């Protein structure tokens, strides 16, 4: 089975956790896209749900497949957030944001009673950091913000490139109008300390470390198994 097939299987399993009249957080990324498509099929069959999308792209996809969507302003409390991850590490700590929606993804996850992660087995790791950590920053004073990020990394013994994410010849811009630095630090042994230190930098809007938010992960395995993992399983 290829990776795309595994993503579809994880997304299909996630539908078993969705019930009528649920208020759903709907994620962003390739695995979330598969979930949206399958959710649309269930809605067409009569499932009643309302979603809050974590990006403009996911909202457009929901509308395309017939999934009713609203905003957090209209529905500030959600029952279940279903989203992918770039890495799933110990104690269900995640790296997210490869799709550029990390700020909204974290807001929606925090507004949800539970967060369910859907992924293929390649996303499960013993130590976070092989995937670049996205750091969303305000465009104002970016060189100063970058310097402070580098200082945080140095203080925590992290080394590696910090690269401004590009979209062609221009910086990639998030739905919130911010830019993203991708930090290639390789191995993040103290994610909570790093999280706190990054958020203490005034120019940092958010980062892609998620801890204390996900309660379960559905992981599709290459051998055909689908595992439902709790934080205690890591």
From Swiss-Prot:
Q: What function is annotated for this protein? A: Catalyzes the reversible conversion of ribose-5-phosphate to ribulose 5-phosphate.
Task: Name the chemical reaction catalysed here.
Answer: aldehydo-D-ribose 5-phosphate = D-ribulose 5-phosphate
Residues at the catalytic site? 105 (proton acceptor)
Enzyme Commission designation? 5.3.1.6
| Pathways per UniProt | Carbohydrate degradation; pentose phosphate pathway; D-ribose 5-phosphate from D-ribulose 5-phosphate (non-oxidative stage): step 1/1
Protein name in UniProt: Ribose-5-phosphate isomerase A
- Database matches in PANTHER family: RIBOSE-5-PHOSPHATE ISOMERASE
Q: Which GO terms describe its biological process?
A: D-ribose metabolic process; pentose-phosphate shunt, non-oxidative branch
Class in the EC hierarchy, top level: isomerase
**Natural source organism:** Bartonella quintana (strain Toulouse)
Residues the record lists as binding substrate:
28-31, 83-86, 96-99, 123
List the Gene3D superfamilies: 3.30.70.260, 3.40.50.1360
A single Pfam family, by name? Rib_5-P_isom_A
Sorted UniProt keywords? Isomerase
Question: Which Gene Ontology CC terms are recorded?
Answer: cytosol
